[in-house]
A protein has these predicted regions:
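Cysteine-nucleophile active-site neighborhood
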Residues: 1-56
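Amide-donor transfer/coupling interface in amidating biosynthetic enzymes
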Residues: 5-7, 40-137
Length: 137
C-alpha cells in the first residue's frame, strides 16, 4: 500500500479509524504506532463539560479551513471517542466543535482522512465520496 500511495501517487482516503491510522501514534490501547503518514497523535476526547458526551455520536457541523482539499462545509455524522491532533496545523483541513475544536479532516499531498462517516452522512457524505473518486491530486 505504501508504494502505491507514495511512489504511484494513488489517492488515499481514511475514514474514522482509517484517519486515525494516518497519525504517528495513538493511545487507544496504550501507545500504539500508526502509519505516520501525517505526523500527529490520536488522543482521547477530554470531557471538559459534563454536558459533552463521549463518544461523540451524531450530526455535527464541519467547518473547512481555507486550504481544504475535497472537504466542504456541511453537516456530517460522527461516532468516535478519540481525535487526531496533527503536529502541523496546516494538515487540519476541517474542524468540528464538540466541547472545543476537534479535527474533522486531515490531508496532505494525495492523502485525505475524515473523522466523520461519509457513508452515514447522506447527501453530504455521498458528495465527498464522489469528489474523492474524481480527485486527481
Amino acid at each position: 500500500m505504501r508504494e502505491r500511495v507514495f511512489v504511484g501517487g494513488a489517492p488515499f482516503l481514511g475514514i474514522c479509524v482509517g484517519m486515525q491510522l494516518l497519525a504517528t501514534t495513538g493511545v487507544e490501547h496504550g501507545d500504539t504506532p500508526g502509519l505516520g503518514w501525517i505526523p500527529g497523535e490520536v488522543r482521547l476526547i477530554e470531557r471538559t463539560d459534563r454536558a459533552i458526551k463521549v463518544p461523540h455520536m451524531g450530526w455535527n457541523d464541519v467547518q473547512i479551513r481555507p486550504h481544504a482539499a475535497l472537504v466542504e462545509a456541511g453537516e456530517a455524522y460522527f461516532l468516535h471517542s478519540y481525535h487526531f491532533v496533527p503536529d502541523d496545523g496546516h494538515h487540519a483541513l476541517a474542524m468540528t466543535d464538540h466541547g472545543g475544536g476537534l479535527v474533522a479532516a486531515v490531508g496532505r499531498d494525495n492523502l485525505i482522512g475524515v473523522q466523520f462517516h461519509p457513508e452515514k452522512s447522506q447527501t453530504y457524505g455521498l458528495a465527498l465520496l464522489a469528489r474523492f473518486l474524481d480527485w486527481k491530486p
